[in-house]
């Protein structure tokens, strides 16, 4: 590390814990603020999604790294993990980045259906993203992944987090674990 220039030193996001939880056939991944596509001119090793994807393999549920900011969900990461469900823990008007949502929804990254759930999809962000924003399954609320006994299937339940009653807004699935 001492040999790296100061601007190439790992930051706290690069040191995030990446975690896969498996139950039966279900694999759930969350990687915190793990960085993906490096900024222009930065070393390739800063794309930490590549080694994580290689170790991870396919998953059913993917909590999108770094809040869906500008750098996560690289094509390699998506092609390797092939999630059925993406959850974006957005909280800022810059989340998700239009390029990230485009990659998540693209069947060029990997074939098959996929559903995207966004915790706080703000109106200015939707306007910036345009028609693609209409393809998300949820644009706000608390997202719960409810796994059936044995892990062969799961549902995604979106709760209204604007009050303490957490009423159900929508239920999606069942999805089959593979």
Question: At which residue positions do the language-model features occur?
Answer:
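Short acidic, glycine/proline-enriched helix-loop-strand junctions
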Residues: 81, 95-119
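Flexible, acidic/histidine-containing loops and adjacent segments that form or flank the divalent-metal
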Residues: 1-47, 109-178
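Active-site-proximal loop/helix segments of hydrolase catalytic cores
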Residues: 1-99
């Amino acid at each position: 590390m001492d040999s790296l220039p100061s601007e190439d030193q790992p930051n706290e996001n690069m040191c995030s814990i990446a975690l896969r939880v498996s139950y039966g056939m279900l694999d759930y991944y969350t990687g915190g603020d793990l960085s993906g596509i490096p900024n222009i001119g930065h070393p390739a090793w800063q794309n930490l999604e590549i080694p994580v994807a290689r170790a991870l393999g396919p998953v059913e549920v993917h909590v999108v790294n770094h809040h869906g900011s500008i750098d996560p969900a690289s094509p390699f990461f998506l092609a390797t993990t092939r999630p059925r469900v993406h959850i974006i823990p957005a909280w800022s008007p810059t989340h998700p980045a239009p390029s990230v949502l485009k990659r998540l929804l693209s069947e060029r990254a990997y074939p098959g259906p996929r559903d995207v759930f966004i915790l706080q999809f703000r109106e200015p962000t939707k306007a910036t993203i345009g028609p693609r924003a209409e393809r998300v399954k949820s644009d706000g609320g608390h997202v719960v992944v409810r796994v059936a006994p044995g892990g062969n299937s799961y549902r995604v339940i979106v709760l209204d987090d604007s009050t303490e009653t957490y009423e159900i807004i929508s239920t999606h699935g069942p999805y089959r674990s593979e």
